[in-house]
């Protein structure tokens, strides 16, 4: 069902899977009270490492040609679509939400990445504020690493609402 490493769900920091400095905790399904798996429990040191990794990656991501950044976001959307059923099943099991909601939420996650992929080119030009009678000048620049916190009720889809626009704008993300 849900794909995970033999050591449970780990943190991904600087492209590597790492255990949490705070040990781990069991994630329990509200559906049947079964243990789904062990999840890395992060601590302040883990957050600091993730923030430093995001800061180090920021210049490369920020300066990437928009065409390349858009292509990456579209590949993410395609990956979500390819695994939408698995994502929905995991979300049902993890949150207790009904299939009819989670199956749509998984697809919506892909749609969020596609939408923001289409916004990559306009992320810096300010042209969304066009007016026939006024001159609008907007300077948009990526601000750096963005910290994202996701609520528990629809975590996958709500994560995409936050991660996709940040990546499209040229920011890196700690989630």
Question: Where on the chain are the PLM-derived regions?
Answer:
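Hydrophobic face of amphipathic alpha-helices that form TPR/SEL1-like repeat modules
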Residues: 1-32
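Conserved strand-loop elements at the edges of beta-sheets that form or border functional pockets
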Residues: 29, 41, 140
């Amino acid at each position: 069902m849900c794909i995970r490493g033999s050591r449970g769900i780990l943190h991904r920091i600087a492209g590597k899977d790492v255990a949490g400095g705070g040990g781990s905790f069991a994630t329990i399904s509200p559906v049947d009270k079964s243990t789904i798996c062990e999840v890395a429990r992060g601590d302040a040191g883990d957050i600091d490492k993730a923030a430093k990794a995001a800061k180090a990656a920021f210049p490369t991501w920020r300066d990437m040609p928009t065409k390349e950044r858009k292509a990456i976001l579209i590949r993410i959307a395609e990956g979500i679509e390819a695994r939408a059923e698995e994502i929905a099943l995991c979300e049902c099991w993890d949150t207790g939400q009904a299939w009819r909601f989670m199956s749509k939420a998984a697809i919506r996650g892909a749609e969020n990445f596609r939408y923001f992929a289409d916004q990559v080119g306009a992320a810096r030009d300010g042209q969304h504020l066009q007016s026939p009678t006024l001159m609008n000048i907007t300077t948009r620049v990526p601000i750096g690493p963005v910290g994202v916190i996701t609520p528990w009720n629809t975590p996958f889809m709500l994560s995409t609402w936050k991660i996709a626009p940040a990546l499209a704008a040229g920011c890196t993300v700690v989630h």
